[in-house]
Amino acid sequence: MKVEVVVEVRHTENKQKVIHALENIFTPKKIEEKRSDVGTVLIASCEGHECLEKLRSAIWRQGIQDAARSVIARGIVAEDTVVFSVNKQAAYAGVVSFVTEPNESPLGPITFTVKTSNTRQFLDWIAPRTYRGRVYYQAPPPD
């Protein structure tokens, strides 16, 4: 599994705070910076499910598996690709809040692109189905 995370650092934002927000929900192996019209774009990447453990833990801690599953499932864009976004300000506080509308996050979202050989297994691992508040089926981590 390969994960790429893209987040904008606007001219009015502190880059270290944006990196802190990113690292609250993701463990990158490397972070690249690119200049853009709005400031800087940070591109973080890693391989393996370990880098998404913070995001998964936050989803479980908040008890939002069903909501997360719904949003992430809508982000399946190809047989091997899932794209979803979370609110940058919420991530700074260590909370996961999914962004479903383009302008929902005024400072721009944190956008995840996950490439995996099995999108269903990824979905069942990061946000498993629940029944009456209990996990119905928990898949092993994807490749």
Curated annotation (Swiss-Prot):
Pfam families associated with the record: RNA_binding
Top-level taxon in the UniProt lineage: Archaea
InterPro entries linked: PAB1135-like, Ribosomal_uL5_dom_sf
Similarity comment: family membership: Belongs to the UPF0201 family.
PANTHER family reported in the protein's UniProt record: UPF0201 PROTEIN TK1335
Protein name: UPF0201 protein Pars_1985
Organism: Pyrobaculum arsenaticum (strain DSM 13514 / JCM 11321 / PZ6)
